[in-house]
């Protein structure tokens, strides 16, 4: 991208709080946009200032999924029609990412469909974080900058100065992510093997590794109903763990997640602010990713390496 053209940052309804933090880090104003809602449930998007010839960055997580995704698509379309030089979708939480493959007959691949919708709407680049499946990047024919929340989580874990620490994953599918944490910190890795009878319900779980007398930090990407993460915490405490805390990138927290976290063995549940969390749960803490996304926008504009800012 050319350095001569200006860049502008705009936000959808869902991520304005994060966009404001990103703009504060960039020392630039948040662009003016009007989103009009109609009685029939439709809405319309208009830019309240000229974006002709500008590199436009649109900040919007797609959760709750449908309305925020549609809002983002309209933002992209309006920007292209207003002669923006380029349009970059900044999607901290990429909804539909758990629908990344056909795991049974006659089902859609939602992540691929969303990728197609964004591409057809006209984005030139995607900036996102901790996709549920890395291969989703291959659904796009444009550059995808895939950031990792480890850049904020690892310094936080180190600041706690925990002794007898082990890193754990609540399911085998997250072992690669947890393994990178354990290797970076130089501590053991513990796995949980779970089985489900149906979506959002964990039938059974077994621990693979030793947690007796250990301080456990569970690593995950998404916490939805919190059934898996809280069950893992409770089982580890029963197995002799000294304490259990959890860290996850995306705070979906569908009901009854807040209740489950509060009533569980977890001492704290730490997320990024990729998704706003308005419910009250004293155990929940959010770390901001605004500086990381601001730095990425700077590097995109300056044609600098993105991957060099990753910790892992």
Language-model segments: residues:
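PRPP-associated nucleotide enzymes
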Residues: 1-312
């Amino acid at each position: 991208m050319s350095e001569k053209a200006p860049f502008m940052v705009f936000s959808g309804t869902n991520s304005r709080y994060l966009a404001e933090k990103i703009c504060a880090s960039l020392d630039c104003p948040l662009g003016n946009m009007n989103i009009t809602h109609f009685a029939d449930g439709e809405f319309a998007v208009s830019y309240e200032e000229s974006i002709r010839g500008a590199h436009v960055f649109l900040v919007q997580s797609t959760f709750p999924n449908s309305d925020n995704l549609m809002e983002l698509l309209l933002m992209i379309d309006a920007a292209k029609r207003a002669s923006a030089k380029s349009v970059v979708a900044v999607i901290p939480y990429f909804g539909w990412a758990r629908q990344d493959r056909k795991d049974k007959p006659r089902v859609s691949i939602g992540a691929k469909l969303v990728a197609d919708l964004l591409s057809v709407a006209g984005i030139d680049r995607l900036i996102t974080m901790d996709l549920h499946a890395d291969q989703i990047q291959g659904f796009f024919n444009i550059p995808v900058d895939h950031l990792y929340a480890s850049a904020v989580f690892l310094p936080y874990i180190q600041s706690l100065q925990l002794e007898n620490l082990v890193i754990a994953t609540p399911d085998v599918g997250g072992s690669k992510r947890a393994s990178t944490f354990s290797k970076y910190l130089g501590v053991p890795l513990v796995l949980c093997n779970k089985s489900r009878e149906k979506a959002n319900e964990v039938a059974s779980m077994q621990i693979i590794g030793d947690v007796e007398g250990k301080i456990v930090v569970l690593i995950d990407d998404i916490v939805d109903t919190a059934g898996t993460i809280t069950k893992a915490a409770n089982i580890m405490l029963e197995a002799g763990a000294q304490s259990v805390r959890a860290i996850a990138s995306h705070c979906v927290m569908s009901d009854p997640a807040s209740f489950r976290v509060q009533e569980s063995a977890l001492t704290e549940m730490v997320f990024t602010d990729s998704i706003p969390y308005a419910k009250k749960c004293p155990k929940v803490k959010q770390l901001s990713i605004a500086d990381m996304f601001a730095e990425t926008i700077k590097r995109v504009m300056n044609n600098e390496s993105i991957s060099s800012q990753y910790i892992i």
